[in-house]
Amino acid sequence: MSAKGKTGRKKASKGTSNSAKAGLQFPVGRIGRYLKKGKYAKRVGAGAPVYLAAVLEYLCAEILELAGNAARDNKKSRITPRHIQLAVRNDEELNKFLAGVTFASGGVLPNIHNVLLPKKSQLKAGTANQDY
C-alpha cells in the first residue's frame, strides 16, 4: 500500500496582499486600480499605489489622533465632525493643507473679536469710580 499522489505536494497557501507586504492598512490594490482607471497617466508604476496608500494612511492617522484628543478634551468617547473640524483648524499645517475644505456639521471655531471684549482698565476702575 502506497500513499498515491500524496508525496511532495504542499497545501496551497493564501497569497498575501500588497497592503500586508507594505505593512499598511489602506488598500494598495484598490488605490492602484483607481489610479489606472482615473487616466491620470498612461502608465502607473508598481510603487506609486504603495506610496500613495502610505501617505493617505499617515494623514488619516494624524487627523484622527488630533480629533481623538479634541473629543477627550470635551469629555466625549466618540469622534464627531465637530472634533475633526477643531483638530484640523487648530493645527497650523493641516489648516493650511485643508484651507478650502468645508466639514459638514463641523461648526465654527470659538472666537471673540478683540474689539468686542471689555477693556481691562475699565474693569478695574469702572466699578469703584462711577460718577452719577
UniProtKB/Swiss-Prot annotation:
Recorded superkingdom: Eukaryota
InterPro entries, per database record: Histone-fold, Histone_H2A, Histone_H2A/H2B/H3, Histone_H2A_C, Histone_H2A_CS
First-listed, main subcellular location of the protein, grouped into a coarse class: nucleus
Biased amino acid composition, Basic residues: 1-13
Annotated region described as Disordered, given as residue ranges: 1-21
Coiled-coil region(s): none
GO molecular function: DNA binding; protein heterodimerization activity; structural constituent of chromatin
SUPFAM superfamilies, alphabetized: Histone-fold
A cellular component annotation (GO) from this entry: nucleosome
Location(s) in or outside the cell: Nucleus; Chromosome
Keyword annotations from UniProtKB, A to Z: Chromosome, DNA-binding, Nucleosome core, Nucleus
Role this protein plays: Core component of nucleosome. Nucleosomes wrap and compact DNA into chromatin, limiting DNA accessibility to the cellular machineries which require DNA as a template. Histones thereby play a central role in transcription regulation, DNA repair, DNA replication and chromosomal stability. DNA accessibility is regulated via a complex set of post-translational modifications of histones, also called histone code, and nucleosome remodeling.
Subunit structure: The nucleosome is a histone octamer containing two molecules each of H2A, H2B, H3 and H4 assembled in one H3-H4 heterotetramer and two H2A-H2B heterodimers. The octamer wraps approximately 147 bp of DNA.
Family that this chain belongs to: Belongs to the histone H2A family.
Protein name per the record: Histone H2A
